[in-house]
């Protein structure tokens, strides 16, 4: 994940220069994590209030003009109602959404497919150079699946 930080910093600059609205989803787990389905299968991570829960300092997202941080307790953010949740009126055919982040094979793919399900006419792009998977093989497999689900994947190196 550390290897993508320079690319993500550049992407944030691009978003800022374009005046884009940025939504950051943030894994947020609590003391009961080990008792959850996810917690029984994955090691403890992103525990609320710890350094591992924070967005890394190198990504100065607060410099973005328009952003929102949405905490999520599992792989995907489950409230992608643009108008109700974010106060953004939309015509789904006009939505142009780019997704970046970690973990490609868990969180990125889940959110991409959720958004595609809610908004099938939206243009959804995943920038592979700004994503990291749990392994290189799973990263590639997730990108392949997203492409097969009509999600545009760019910068596959």
Provide a role label for each language-model segment.
Residues 1-3, 39-46:
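Short glycine-enriched, charge-decorated loop/helix-capping segments at active-site entrances
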Residues 7-20, 43-157:
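Active-site-adjacent betaalpha module
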Residues 14-32:
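Von Willebrand factor
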Residues 32-38:
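Metal-dependent catalytic neighborhoods of phosphoester/phosphodiester hydrolases
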């Amino acid at each position: 994940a550390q290897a993508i930080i320079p690319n993500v910093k550049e992407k944030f600059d691009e978003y800022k220069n374009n005046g884009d609205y940025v939504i950051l989803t943030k894994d947020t787990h609590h003391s009961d994590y080990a008792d959850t389905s996810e917690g029984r299968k994955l090691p403890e991570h992103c525990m609320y209030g710890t350094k591992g829960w924070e967005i890394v300092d190198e990504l100065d997202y607060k410099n973005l003009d328009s952003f929102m941080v949405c905490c999520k307790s599992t792989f995907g953010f489950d409230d992608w109602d643009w108008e109700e949740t974010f106060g953004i009126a939309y015509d789904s055919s006009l939505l142009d959404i780019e997704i970046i982040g970690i973990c490609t094979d868990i969180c990125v793919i889940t959110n991409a497919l959720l958004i595609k399900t809610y908004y099938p006419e939206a243009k959804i792009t995943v920038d592979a150079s700004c994503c990291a998977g749990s392994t290189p093989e799973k990263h590639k497999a997730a990108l392949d699946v997203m492409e097969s689900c009509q999600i545009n994947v760019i910068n596959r190196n």
